[in-house]
C-alpha cells in the first residue's frame, strides 16, 4: 500500500492528466518507475483508479488512468488532511517567530 503522500501525488497528477505514462509519472514525481508501478497497482486494487487502454498515434497500446468516484473522494480527503497539517505547521512556526521577536525586543 502506498504511503499517504505518494497516493495523494499520484491521484492529483492523474486527475490533471490521465494519459501520463508510468515513466512520465516517475520523472515528474521524482520516484522510481518500480514505485510508480507498485503504487498504481495498489490504487487499482482498492478501486481508486481504473485503467483503459487505447492505441496512440504510433499505433502502440497506451494506458489511461482514470480516477473513480472513490478515488476522487480519497483525493479530496487527502487534500483536506494535508491542508490541516500545513495549517498546523504554519501556526507553530508563527508562534516560534513571535517568541523570537518578543525575546529580541525584550517583551
Locate each region found by the language model.
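Short helix-to-turn junction characteristic of helix-turn-helix DNA-binding domains
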Residues: 14-18
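Key DNA-contact positions within bacterial/archaeal DNA-binding proteins
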Residues: 23, 34, 38
